[in-house]
């Protein structure tokens, strides 16, 4: 319902505009979680966070230092959904029409959150998941530090496998038949608007 504005920085090197996106997308040196799950079990998390906690400009590949974040935030602009930047820095597109302004700021642009700490918290969450199977730390850091909604690991893995719910159906179950001791059958459907 809102116009869904997102915060854009200008690269200190090439001056190209890019979204200070929620999540870990700008930490493009960071390996994928599948690779990290093995590494974080015994690795020095602080050293890994220091190494991978660098934002990478998607235009020129430069890695501005964290000390530039305040300057980048001061020069940042809010861009509504439907608008993008050309290579010359011109805003083009049609902004979404709404009487409600909405803003989504990723943790990467948060004033009191260092890039290194965002990566470190993610790595600690992955370590906890790898050692205990608990997703609580991952969920917390994703929601609060990264500014992203958390998706449970089994859904991420199912999405990555390319399987649909229909592909995972158990073939030996008969349709419209319930076990003999069943006392009640409840059915619910969650319908998202427009989907």
Per-region residue spans from a language model:
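A contiguous, basic/glycine-rich beta-loop/short-helix subdomain that forms a polymer-engagement track
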Residues: 79-188
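Acidic, metal-ligating active-site segments
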Residues: 187-195
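Cys/His-rich short segments
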Residues: 2-106
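Generic alpha-helical structural element
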Residues: 3, 46-49, 130, 134, ...
